[in-house]
């Protein structure tokens, strides 16, 4: 099998990213909604917000903008990430082949190029920052649609209100905090994810490790390795970047009060407490961990299917 034959087509990353992102967004929307509502009020608790929900369907409020943002964003991000990582791997002549055991002894669960930890960190951060800017308007609409501070009845009403009150800048409100959260998160995530895929096969019980006739892992084994790696990596990266998520949410919900990232940070620390910077972490942790497991598990397998 030649390098050209083993190289995934670019469209496979768009398709894999889109469906992985869409599935995780719809399935985990309740966690995202609860996280937003906990962060908007310094006295809010999970139990208090759950009691205010009149019907289970209300937990999926804001699903459309969330699904659009996550599916489109995931497709663009993973395509952009693959383009950068493949370009770097080509230059170093390090694109792995499923038939070259010396190259893939630690990453037989994946068909993605293998880079250094430093390269994984930088490509993940840069790709996320770029795509985050492109999808920022959808993010702002999504956050406000989920919040109880705005009672939008439709996406059209949300768009009209934001544009009328704040102009085009309103659709990019909180981008600085979002970028400070997402770029480090993505960089850390890709670094940890790729390293976990190398290490997990070495520590998993032998009953979980099965090989196909070509020498790579079976679908069961690769899915186990990739999904577990995604959950572990997302959990750690989410915890580290949690304060930026709280700052971003406050800026998008109360733009007149919180005008910039530093002002928001000092206000929370001074008027509330440092722990409030981690408000909603349990919801975000659960959502990001499961989301990464679902999205990256689907993405990795679809990429291999479209090779």
UniProtKB/Swiss-Prot annotation:
The keyword Mitochondrion applies. It holds the Pfam family Mito_carr. Solcar repeats lie at residues 8-87, 115-199, 221-305. It is found in: Mitochondrion; Mitochondrion inner membrane. GO terms for molecular function: glycine transmembrane transporter activity. It is a multi-pass membrane protein. Signal peptide: none annotated. It catalyses: glycine(in) = glycine(out). The chain crosses the membrane at residues 14-39, 62-88, 121-146, 174-197, 225-251, 280-298. GO terms for cellular component: mitochondrial inner membrane; mitochondrion. SUPFAM superfamilies: Mitochondrial carrier. Keywords: Membrane, Mitochondrion, Mitochondrion inner membrane, Repeat, Transmembrane, Transmembrane helix, Transport. Disruption phenotype: Yeasts grow well on the fermentable carbon source dextrose, but only poorly aerobically on glycerol, indicating a defect in respiration. Furthermore, the deletion strain is unable to reduce sodium nitroprusside, indicating that the defect is likely in heme biosynthesis. Nitroprusside reduction can be rescued by supplementation of the medium with either glycine or 5-aminolevulinate (ALA). In combination with a disruption of MCX1, abrogates mitochondrial respiration. Present with 1550 molecules/cell in log phase SD medium. Belongs to the mitochondrial carrier (TC 2.A.29) family. SLC25A38 subfamily. Mitochondrial glycine transporter that imports glycine into the mitochondrial matrix. Plays an important role in providing glycine for the first enzymatic step in heme biosynthesis, the condensation of glycine with succinyl-CoA to produce 5-aminolevulinate (ALA) in the mitochondrial matrix. HAMAP family: SLC25A38. This is Mitochondrial glycine transporter. The lineage of its organism: Eukaryota, Fungi, Dikarya, Ascomycota, Saccharomycotina.
